[in-house]
C-alpha cells in the first residue's frame, strides 16, 4: 500500500516529476512533509534564505500564521525564528552538533568592564546597544542581555573592576611588611626566647613550691624575748617519759628543757607538774608560785 501523500500535488515531494535537487536531502537524512506541504529534514536547520524571508515578511506586517501558510513552514518554526531574531538580532541557526560560537571574547569582556567602570548604573541592554554603536560587535555576534548580565556577575569580572584599587593597596603593602620584619626578630630567635622564658618560669615555680612545703612541714618556734622559754614548753607538749625507759629515770637538763616542770619525787606518769611562767601572768596576779 502506497502512502497517502504519494501523489501529493506539490513539487517539493522528492517523487514528484517537477522536484528540484536539494543538497540538504542528498545525505540520506530522514525527510518528511509537514501539514502545509513543506519538506523538512530532521536535525537540520531551515535554509538561510527562508529565514531571511520570514523576517522580511514580519517586518512588513505579515502575521506569523500567514507567513506559515505562504512559505509552508510550521507555525512553531516561524515563531522560534522571529523570537531568536528579536532577542539576538541574528537569523543564523546554531552550530550543528556543537555549541554556538563564543561571542564573549576577551575584547568584548574588556569593553563591557570599561562601560561598567565608567557608569556602574548602566543596564545590560544599554551595554549591548553601546557595543553595536561603537562597532565592537555586529548585529550577528553581539552578546545577548542574559550573557552580559552573566559576565557582569562573574567573579573574574568583579576582580577586573577592582584591579585599579588592588594595585594601590599592593604598593603600600611592601612598606608595612618591611617595617614588620625590621621590628620583629627571626622566627628561630623568637622560639628560643620563648623556650628560655618558659624554663625560667618553671624553675621559679619549683623553688616557690619547695619553700612553701618546707614552711608547712617545719613547726614555728617563737622564742620569747629575753627568756629561755619556747612555745612547745609553754603549751606543755613535751614527750611524757616512761618508767620502762632507763634514760628518763635520771633527769638531765642537757637532754630536755626542764625549766617549766619539776618533779614531786619519784618519776611517774602523773608526777609532772606544770609551772606557770612569769611572762604570761597578768599584771595584777598576786598568787604564789
From Swiss-Prot:
Tree of life domain: Eukaryota
User: Does the keyword section mention Kinase?
Assistant: no
Localization recorded for this chain is: Nucleus; Chromosome
**Disordered, as annotated region:** 166-198
Q: Name one GO molecular function term.
A: RNA polymerase II transcription regulatory region sequence-specific DNA binding
Which is a GO BP term held by this UniProt record? embryo development ending in birth or egg hatching
User: GO CC terms for this protein?
Assistant: chromatin; nucleus
DNA-binding region at which residues?
Answer: 29-155
InterPro entries in UniProt: Homeodomain-like_sf (IPR009057), PAIRED_DNA-bd_dom (IPR043182), Paired_dom (IPR001523), PAX_fam (IPR043565), WH-like_DNA-bd_sf (IPR036388)
Q: Name one Pfam family in it.
A: PAX
Q: Where is this chain compositionally biased, Low complexity type?
A: 166-179, 189-198
The UniProt annotation puts the region (PAI subdomain) at 32-88
| Record annotation: effect of changing residue 37 to S | In sy287; abnormal tail in males. Normal egg-laying by hermaphrodites when grown at 15 degrees Celsius, but defective at 25 degrees. Mostly normal morphology in vulval cell vulF. Reduced expression of lin-48 in hindgut cells
> Looking at the record, which segments are called RED subdomain?
107-155
Keyword vocabulary terms for this entry: Chromosome, Developmental protein, DNA-binding, Nucleus, Paired box, Transcription, Transcription regulation
**Function of the protein:** Transcription factor. Binds to specific DNA sequence motifs in regulatory elements, for example in the genes encoding transcription factor lin-48, apoptosis regulator ced-9 and neuropeptide-like protein nlp-2. Specifies cell fate, playing an essential role in embryonic and larval development. Involved in morphogenesis of the vulva and uterus in hermaphrodites and of the rectal epithelium of the tail in males. Plays multiple roles in the development of the egg-laying system, acting in both lin-3/EGF-pathway-dependent and -independent processes.
State what protein this is by name.
Paired box protein 5 homolog
Q: Which organism is it from?
A: Caenorhabditis elegans
Provide the taxonomic classification: Eukaryota, Metazoa, Ecdysozoa, Nematoda, Chromadorea
Instruction: Name the gene for this chain.
Output: egl-38
Amino acid at each position: 500500500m502506497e502512502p497517502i501523500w504519494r501523489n501529493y500535488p506539490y513539487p517539493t515531494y522528492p517523487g514528484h516529476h517537477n522536484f528540484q535537487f536539494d543538497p540538504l536531502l542528498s545525505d540520506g537524512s530522514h525527510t518528511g512533509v509537514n501539514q502545509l506541504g513543506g519538506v523538512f529534514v530532521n536535525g537540520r536547520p531551515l535554509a538561510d534564505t527562508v529565514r531571511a524571508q520570514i523576517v522580511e515578511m514580519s517586518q512588513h506586517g505579515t502575521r506569523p500564521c500567514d507567513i506559515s501558510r505562504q512559505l509552508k513552514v510550521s507555525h512553531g518554526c516561524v515563531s522560534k525564528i522571529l523570537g531568536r531574531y528579536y532577542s539576538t538580532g541574528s537569523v543564523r541557526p546554531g552550530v550543528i552538533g556543537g555549541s554556538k560560537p563564543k561571542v564573549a571574547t576577551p575584547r568584548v569582556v574588556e569593553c563591557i568592564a570599561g562601560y561598567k567602570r565608567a557608569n556602574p548604573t548602566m543596564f545590560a541592554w544599554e551595554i549591548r546597544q553601546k557595543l553595536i554603536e561603537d562597532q565592537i560587535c555586529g548585529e550577528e555576534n553581539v552578546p545577548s542581555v542574559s550573557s552580559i548580565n552573566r559576565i557582569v556577575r562573574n567573579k573574574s569580572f568583579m576582580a577586573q573592576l577592582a584591579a585599579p584599587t588592588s594595585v594601590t593597596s599592593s604598593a603600600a603593602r611592601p612598606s608595612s611588611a618591611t617595617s614588620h620584619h625590621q621590628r620583629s626578630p627571626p622566627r628561630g630567635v623568637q622560639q628560643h626566647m620563648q623556650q628560655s622564658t618558659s624554663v625560667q618560669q618553671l624553675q621559679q615555680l619549683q623553688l616557690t613550691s619547695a619553700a612553701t612545703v618546707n614552711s608547712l612541714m617545719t613547726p614555728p618556734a617563737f622564742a620569747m624575748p629575753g627568756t629561755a622559754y619556747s612555745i612547745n614548753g609553754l603549751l606543755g607538749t613535751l614527750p611524757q617519759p616512761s618508767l620502762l625507759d632507763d634514760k628518763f629515770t635520771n633527769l638531765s637538763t642537757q637532754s630536755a628543757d626542764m625549766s617549766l616542770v619539776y618533779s614531786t619525787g619519784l618519776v611517774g606518769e602523773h608526777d609532772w607538774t606544770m609551772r606557770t611562767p612569769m611572762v604570761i601572768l597578768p599584771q595584777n596576779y598576786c598568787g604564789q608560785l
